[in-house]
Curated annotation (Swiss-Prot):
The keyword Phosphoprotein applies. GO terms for cellular component: cytoplasm; nucleus. It comes from the Eukaryota. GO terms for biological process: circadian regulation of gene expression; entrainment of circadian clock by photoperiod; negative regulation of transcription by RNA polymerase II. The lineage of its organism: Eukaryota, Metazoa, Ecdysozoa, Arthropoda, Hexapoda. Keywords: Biological rhythms, Nucleus, Phosphoprotein, Repeat. This is Period circadian protein. Forms a heterodimer with timeless (TIM); the complex then translocates into the nucleus. Phosphorylated with a circadian rhythmicity. GO terms for molecular function: transcription cis-regulatory region binding; transcription corepressor binding.
Length: 354
């Protein structure tokens, strides 16, 4: 889509001269890695069924996290240093509007961009009121969902880490403890809250957090489908700017023995999630067995209640053969759904543009 209008905050935030975006395509200013996600978001918005005046029911807005290019002449602000082109993270809110002109009604896309800032200001900042965020990964470790609330704390954009190995984010020295945590999750269905452990931010440094764990056990396969973690940040990383690129000079050199040990821990966690017989699975099995037994008992009692009435009908038919007869068919349909509704927290964060 071609940009038709911008607010003055575009200049103060990204440094572009006034009206420089007018007549150009918005996607030209989007980071190349975010363009597919951006295009998909726009396409899905246009595909929503419209009602009167071309508005979606309630005119709902969709959101996504996206990096937008800064003006090359801008010399201040955070971002990746020593690069010709730098980008800044934003939460984009999309709404579609109908505007009537001399050519008729035209649908315009209105984008409200809210800049993300790092949640930390000083190295290893102790955090007391961090906004919790949710991550969900499958039994094979693949990250399936991450909250937008995580962006100021971890620095990752959701599309950068989705379908990646969530276990790679854990500090190698904490994998031993986390293996015990996962064993408890599988056996008990969850963990109320863990001890503090470390997770890697986008800049390569680690922050400390505590997590409330839960899981979903498929009642049909009796296997763990996914694990949900509600994370509470308690201490920031040594580099407070989580949006910076990792410093290769700070990378810790590991011996081959340490690497092998780290890989073994991760394999053991995956095996735990896929092989250990779980208490929740047994509970689900018992619940399903009880439902079947209850259904069978109900059907038996129903048939017993209907039996005297059927006999009376038969006697009436014998006494008065001229009366037409009828049948009573009793049908009961029962269904047990293996699906469990889980609502991912949807919210936005950041400071609105001024």
């Amino acid at each position: 889509g071609i940009v038709m209008y911008t607010t003055s905050s575009l200049t103060t935030t990204l440094g572009f001269p006034k009206d420089m975006w007018i007549g150009r395509s918005f996607i030209d200013f989007v980071h190349p890695r975010d363009r597919n996600t951006f295009a998909s978001q726009i396409t899905s918005g246009l595909a929503v069924p419209k009602i009167v005046n071309g508005q979606s029911p309630g005119n709902p807005a969709s959101t996504m996290v996206c990096r937008i290019r800064r003006y090359r002449g801008l010399t201040t602000g955070f971002g990746v240093k020593d690069r010709v082109v730098t980008f800044m993270p934003f939460l984009l809110k999309f709404t579609f509007k109908n505007v009537s002109d001399e050519e008729g009604k035209v649908i315009y896309l209105v984008i409200q961009a809210t800049q993300f800032f790092s949640a930390f200001r000083i190295p290893s900042e102790v955090v007391s009121k961090a906004v919790p965020f949710v991550m969900r990964h499958a039994a094979n470790g693949n990250l399936e969902y991450i909250d937008p609330e995580s962006v100021p704390y971890l620095g990752y954009l959701p599309q950068d880490v989705t379908d990646k190995d969530a276990l790679q984010l854990y500090h190698p020295e904490d994998l031993d403890y986390l293996q015990q945590v996962y064993e408890t999750i599988v056996k008990e269905g969850g963990v109320p809250r863990t001890k503090a452990y470390r997770m890697m931010a986008q800049n390569g440094d680690y922050l400390k957090l505590e997590t409330e764990w839960s899981s979903f056990i498929n009642p049909w396969s009796k296997r763990l489908d996914f694990v949900i973690g509600k994370h509470h940040i308690i201490e920031g990383p040594s580099n407070p700017d989580v949006f910076q690129s990792p410093d290769p000079e700070k990378a810790v050199a590991m011996s081959e023995e340490e690497k092998a040990k780290e890989q073994k821990y991760r394999r053991d966690i995956i095996r735990t999630m896929n092989e250990v017989l779980t208490k929740p699975a047994e509970v689900a099995k018992q619940q399903m067995t009880k439902r079947c037994q209850d259904l069978a008992s109900f059907m038996e009692s129903l048939m017993e209640e209907q039996q005297p009435k059927v006999d009376e009908d038969l006697r009436l038919d014998i006494q008065d053969p001229d009366h037409s007869y009828y049948q009573r068919d009793s049908v009961m349909l029962g269904g047990i759904s293996p699906h469990h509704d889980y609502n991912d927290s949807k919210s936005s964060t950041g400071t609105p543009l001024s």
